[in-house]
Structure formats: C-alpha cells, structure tokens
Amino acid sequence: MDNIAGKVVVITGASSGIGEATAKRLAEKGAKLVLAARREDRLKALADEIVRLGGEAAHAVADVASAEDMRKTAGLAMERYGRIDVLVNNAGIMPVSRLSELRVEDWDRMIDVNVKGVLHGIAAVLPVMREQRSGHIVNLSSTSGYAVSPTSVVYGATKFAVRAITDGLRQEESAASGIRATLVAPGLTETELLNGLTSPEARAIAERIKGLGMSPDRIADAIVYAIGQPDDASVSEIIVRPTALAM
C-alpha cells in the first residue's frame, strides 16, 4: 500500500461508520485527510485523534446536498495541501419504506444526499483532478444497487444511480485524464444508517437483522485496497457482503 502515503484524501460522511473507519485506516497509511460531515463535534474529535497519533487531518462542516458546501470543502483541501488526490464519496442516508407509505420527504432527501451529493462531490474535485491529470474518486453504493427489494425501492434506485455515475465517470475520465473511478458496494454494515428509520415495517426488518452486519473496518479495508493500487491499475468495482446474510 505504498501508493497511499502523502496522498490528499477528502472523505464525506467522515464523522462515523465507514467514513470514520476509512479515515483512520488512511491516516495509518500516511494520507493527508480532509474530513467532511455535518456534525462538527464528531469531526473535530476525529481530526484531533488523527493528529495526536501523528497523522494529518483538517475538517470541514459540510452537507453533501449543498454544492456550495462541497466546493468549500475542496477549497479547504487546496488551501491546506495544494492538491486533491482522492475523493471518497461516502455520505449517505437510508430512511427506507414501501412506496405505498408515500414518504415523499424521505425520497427527496435520499435523492439529494445519495445521488446529488455524489455529483456535488465530483463537481467539486473534478476540475482540480483534470488539471493535475490524476486523481481517484471512490463512490459508495450498496448491494441494494444490484437488486431491488420491498421497502428499499427508492434507496435502491439511488444506489443504482451511483453505479451508473461511477461507470460513466470511469469511461469519460480514465484514459482521457488519468482519473480513476471505483464503486464500493457494501452489504449490511454496522453503521448509523438504520438508526433513523420511521417506517414500522422497516424498523421491524432492521431489528431482525441486528447484529448480522459487518464492521465498518471491512469496508474501509476495501477502500484502502482500491486507493493503494499502482497508478496503472484501476479497481472498478468491489462488493463486500456479510458472511451471516445471503442478501
């Protein structure tokens, strides 16, 4: 993994779960981090911990649904480190429910965060990476981006969209500008994603599968693997599923 040391990595959704685990793994490998999320207290605590252990980290309070917030986050990376080598588009939400429940506000928010948020991240870093003629964008999808299931229709649709965006980015930029694109699709992972469920049916499903998910460290390891590959190799797609679940 010698290809990670010194790289400037922007991570969204860095205050907990996969984002936090990825930040810690990359800091151990010598990356310079810009951590973005909405919860400043969690971000600052993580950045302080990384610095205390000898790493480098800055943080920016940002909502990926805001294109301006993502531009400011990229600006912080450029001001602090002068380049952006990697973006980990990790932020996401999962207030799942059946379509018949008509939770339109949840649908809108999932589209804003899970789809527009990915695009806002790309828009913030792509000009920099094109000028550098190098870079790597890692987008977090889900196994729900491969198969639709009841209660997960809109969430799955957002993750199908992330797959399409990532593959399109790869086709447009890889050969033309040397920018790599990787899709990482986790199955059930022990994060905060299920904490905000309001649908009674979805809460019941979450309770049945509680404790069967993977540690966020497993997904962080996959992200680190993709980033650490030599520049002449591009890991296009990684799916990681928990052993305890067939779904």
Segments from the language model and where they lie:
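Conserved glycine-rich cofactor-binding loop
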Residues: 8, 15-16
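Active-site helix of classical SDR
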Residues: 122, 158
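C-terminal helical subdomain
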Residues: 179, 183-184, 203-247
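The beta1-alpha1 cofactor-binding region of Rossmann-like NAD(H)/NADP(H)-dependent oxidoreductases
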Residues: 40-41, 61-73, 104
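Conserved glycine-rich Rossmann-like NAD(P)H-binding loop of the short-chain dehydrogenase/reductase
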Residues: 31-46
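Residue(s) in the substrate-gating loop at a strand-loop-helix junction
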Residues: 142
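Substrate-binding pocket helix/loop in short-chain dehydrogenase/reductase
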Residues: 98-99, 106-111
